[in-house]
Amino acid sequence: MSEHYYTKSPRSESDRRRFEAVLLGRRLTFETDAGVFSKSGVDFGSRLLIETADIPDGARVLDVGCGYGPIGLAIAAARPSARVTMLDINERAVGLARANAERNGIRNVTILASDGLEAVRGQTFDAVLTNPPIRAGKAVVHRIFEEAHGALAPGGVLWVVIQKKQGAPSAAAKLEELFGAEHVRMAARDKGYHILRAERANNC
């Protein structure tokens, strides 16, 4: 069994590879490695999240579990006025994301190693995006949801991609518990993947 990507310091032997992907109309080059999520290319769920999330110009954006960077870097490249912060517990992934930002000339990003949202405690964001580490277990995923709710500015939105078979209904239930059912909806659905949108109310 391959090493779990939700690991602070992967021990798997390096196996670097490089590929190009067109995201939000921009061609980006990514380098990936063993021990990170979806090392062979941008996964379908992340692509769907990137295409669905409605990120306004100038937004403060947080990408939780950024991996080698496709979600956060695609948004940063498409929204030069946005300020994008990217987090991952996996130090190898963080190094790759930083190198990929440099490789693509993307400057409006800050990329940090972090267990959950620990590294940005006290900061607030207009949008949080996550393709959560399902293999790490429900407790980890729900903690990300809880911390994201706390980090959103009033009116801010959490965007989540999750497969139905990997727990989309229970994820939606948790989001409704945190945000209120009236503030949670399915923004997109394709090939078994659900994009959940949860908006923090102005009065909470």
Which role fits each region the language model picked out?
Residues 1-24, 34-35, 39:
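N-terminal auxiliary segments of SAM/dcSAM-dependent transferases
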Residues 45-130, 136:
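Conserved SAM/SAH cofactor-binding pocket of Class I
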Residues 54, 153, 180:
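Short conserved AdoMet
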Residues 75, 147-149, 175:
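Class I S-adenosylmethionine-dependent transferase superfamily signal
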Residues 142-154:
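A short glycine-rich, Lys/Arg-flanked "PGG" loop and its adjoining helix->strand segment in the class I
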Residues 155-162:
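Conserved beta-strand signature within the Rossmann-like core of class I S-adenosyl-L-methionine
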Residues 163-180:
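Conserved class I S-adenosyl-L-methionine
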Residues 188-204:
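Core SAM-dependent methyltransferase catalytic element
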